[in-house]
Amino acid sequence: MAEITASLVKELRERTGAGMMECKKALVEANGDIELAIDNMRKSGQAKAAKKAGRVAAEGVILARIAEGHGVLVEMNCETDFVAKDAGFLSLANAVADYAVANKGVTIEALQAQFEEQRAALVAKIGENMTIRRVAEIEGKVIAQYLHGAKIGVLVAGEGSADELKKVAMHVAASKPEFVNPEDVSADVVEHERQIQIDIAINSGKPKEIAEKMVEGRMKKFTGEVSLTGQAFVMDPSQTVGSYLKSVNTSVANFIRLEVGEGIEKVEADFAAEVAAMQKV
């Protein structure tokens, strides 16, 4: 049986809003598989929805560069917010971003190798580990960028007004869509959600035939919620992003979004009380 760690329980709590013991029980039943635990909790009504994985615990910066129909986002991490504001750290991060946009198609491995000497020297000087973690690229006729405090970076590519695309980039930063259009949602994602919704309806007492019919409406809502053009526009919730784009004669072909520390978790010392409580049951 998989080990159910305190950090795993904590992540499940953060993503579902359920109680500590409910989360521990769900993880035990799912043999430590957090995604399966979330699915089971949704089906049983313990969790109405779950936040996407992406524990943001690392420090660092996201930088953006755009040049001739090509844009890049680069993430560079460090251990503390103090170092994230250090002139030497920011100088290296900016050099990495400049190199990335000038060398289309560069891999993260190539970036790391190119700047390893400078990185190692800075680590020795400051005494804190740091890494060039991610690079993401986008191409398009018009590209707009939005950086939120150097912690979230978004690039949106499309046609039309750069100013309007920047507004959309701000929306992407806030709302975290996963796809551009509802029809872009992959079949496996749709089927996975469909089965969850059918189980939820059946568990509420509905016959399978009725449950399956009910789910069709829910699926349309689901694909709209996870797609950019189907979401309510943050600057005008009375209309969708898609409707707004049509009104300003602008379209989106693609977007990329990076947030500092996504998927990285630091060991936390303030979880001891809950760990102790877990051991008593």
Curated annotation (Swiss-Prot):
Keywords: Cytoplasm, Elongation factor, Protein biosynthesis. One of its GO terms (cellular component) is cytoplasm. Gene3D superfamilies: 1.10.286.20, DNA helicase RuvA subunit, C-terminal domain (1.10.8.10), Elongation factor Ts, dimerisation domain (3.30.479.20). Its main location: cytoplasm. Residues 80-83 are annotated as: Involved in Mg(2+) ion dislocation from EF-Tu. Disulfide bonds: none annotated. Coiled coil: none annotated. GO terms for molecular function: translation elongation factor activity. It is found in: Cytoplasm. CDD domains: UBA_EF-Ts. Associates with the EF-Tu.GDP complex and induces the exchange of GDP to GTP. It remains bound to the aminoacyl-tRNA.EF-Tu.GTP complex up to the GTP hydrolysis stage on the ribosome. Belongs to the EF-Ts family. This is Elongation factor Ts. It comes from Mannheimia succiniciproducens (strain KCTC 0769BP / MBEL55E).
